[in-house]
């Protein structure tokens, strides 16, 4: 199942409530403010802080 980019209009980072960007190659939603990457599993974003991975600097 593919991620529906229309979801980007309504989802937000659960930590800072900021915008998320879609990384198609890694299948992640990225919060640049918090430097976190949220996984997308089977087209469903997992927006849980404890599942996020820190972005490499």
Swiss-Prot record:
Gene3D superfamilies: 2.20.25.10. GO terms for cellular component: cytosol. Belongs to the UPF0434 family. This is UPF0434 protein Spea_1772. It comes from Shewanella pealeana (strain ATCC 700345 / ANG-SQ1).
């Amino acid at each position: 199942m593919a991620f529906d980019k229309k979801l980007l209009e309504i989802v937000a980072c659960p930590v800072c409530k900021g915008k998320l960007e879609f990384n198609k190659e890694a299948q992640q939603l990225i919060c640049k403010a918090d430097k976190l990457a949220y996984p997308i599993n089977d087209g469903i974003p997992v927006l849980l802080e404890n599942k996020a991975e820190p972005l490499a600097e």
